[in-house]
Amino acid sequence: MVTSVLSSVTISRVSSVLNRDVKQFGKQFLFDGREETCWNSDQGSCQWVLMEFPQNVLVSQIHLQFQGGFSCQTCALEGCYKDGELVKIADFYPEDTNTLQKFTFAEQSVSKLRVSFLNSTDFFGRITLYHLDVLG
């Protein structure tokens, strides 16, 4: 049985926030469990979300829920230990849909995990993400 490895002490960073409006579109809305809030990236290619855990965690699944039209066709999952360089764990390919999508990959032990959104379905490269969870 897999469970979320995210906690209140997980540190997160994002590549950008739409119009720098963190009160309305900030990274905190990725993890709040509410259906009506979301993280919106600003325009530009290769948006990302980075999570830093207080200790090494085992990860084997990622759950994402995009807004259709503002999703990503190719994502890269990278991880490392505390001071190491990020290395690729897996590529995965979400659909352009509003539904929760789940992706499973070989279990990895990491203290940092980055999800990179390599090509947005939006013409301007924006990503709108309502839910992000990492399980292991």
From Swiss-Prot:
The keyword Transport does not apply. It is found in: Nucleus. Gene3D superfamilies: Galactose-binding domain-like (2.60.120.260). Keywords: Nucleus. Belongs to the NR2C2AP family. May act as a repressor of nr2c2-mediated transactivation by suppressing the binding between nr2c2 and its response element in target genes. This is Nuclear receptor 2C2-associated protein.
